[in-house]
Amino acid sequence: MSDISKASLPKAIFLMGPTASGKTALAIELRKILPVELISVDSALIYKGMDIGTAKPNAEELLAAPHRLLNIRDPSQAYSAADFRRDALAEMADITAAGRIPLLVGGTMLYFKALLEGLSPLPSADPEVRARIEQQAAEQGWESLHRQLQEVDPVAAARIHPNDPQRLSRALEVFFISGKTLTELTQTSGDALPYQVHQFAIAPASRELLHQRIEQRFHQMLASGFEAEVRALFARGDLHTDLPSIRCVGYRQMWSYLEGEISYDEMVYRGVCATRQLAKRQITWLRGWEGVHWLDSEKPEQARDEVLQVVGAIAG
């Protein structure tokens, strides 16, 4: 697309970053100054009843800066990148039609990628094919299926660990249904985002600072009643660790504690470690991201001013 035609597109802002980097605080600050409406880009914040462990904006923050795509699913329900793209595009169109600018804030990089680049034409899940794969895994083990994937799609096999049955079975399922590999199909992108996007990433300047913030926040969550929140989910009886909601960082570790599998101290240790690993993956995504403007979360006023400098011209 030429620069002239891109300039004629409606404007949007991406505010990305690892967990505990100060994204929400900056987004709320920007909403006071710019004509923006906020859309959450977070695969955990979509769930109702999961507030403390996801660091969901509190009632006061949401009053000052409402977020769209919060609390839109029950924890028993799945929500895909395709679901997000559909919903986000609808919200963006609604915001643009009102003469305002969508500001998408969050840390689920897969959602940002799906929104920006479109989605590959992957086949829908087939319960029969999936059942055959799981039966084979039960008989031969996931290592055997991983070797099978290596033969048909070595690129995907190098990326997927043998102990990751969800992604492994999906890669094989795609091949069995379509006759094409996951790698081949994901190289075919869908429709690009029809917006002129200003992209920002916020993070502390050092990994040590981010690690400190993550540990502090995890302990703050515990002090705020995180255990009671997960106990309420646990008591429902219809939720389990195979669900995306309960696999969320922090929730999975607390669930293991409630099931008596690990001690409280081990839960805290694992929860902090898992959150740090999540942040590392998010930063790895962002380092390979094109056209992103980096902001230092230890200097919030400077970060705000840098965003205003870049996008201020679009606010008139």
UniProtKB/Swiss-Prot annotation:
GO biological process assignments: tRNA modification
Domain of life according to the entry: Bacteria
Root EC class: transferase
Residues bound to ATP: G17, P18, T19, A20, S21, G22, K23, T24
Residues carrying the site annotation Interaction with substrate tRNA: T108, R130
InterPro entries in the cross-refs: Dimethylallyltransferase, IPT, P-loop_NTPase
Single GO term (MF): tRNA dimethylallyltransferase activity
Keywords: ATP-binding, Magnesium, Nucleotide-binding, Transferase, tRNA processing
Keyword flag Transferase: yes
Interaction with substrate tRNA, as annotated region: 42-45, 166-170, 247-252, 280-287
Catalytic activity: adenosine(37) in tRNA + dimethylallyl diphosphate = N(6)-dimethylallyladenosine(37) in tRNA + diphosphate
Binding site for substrate: T19, A20, S21, G22, K23, T24
Cofactor(s) annotated in UniProt: Mg(2+)
EC number: 2.5.1.75
Function, in words: Catalyzes the transfer of a dimethylallyl group onto the adenine at position 37 in tRNAs that read codons beginning with uridine, leading to the formation of N6-(dimethylallyl)adenosine (i(6)A).
HAMAP family: IPP_trans
NCBIfam families reported in the protein's UniProt record: miaA
Subunit structure: Monomer.
Family in the record: Belongs to the IPP transferase family.
UniProt protein name: tRNA dimethylallyltransferase
Organism the protein comes from: Escherichia coli O1:K1 / APEC
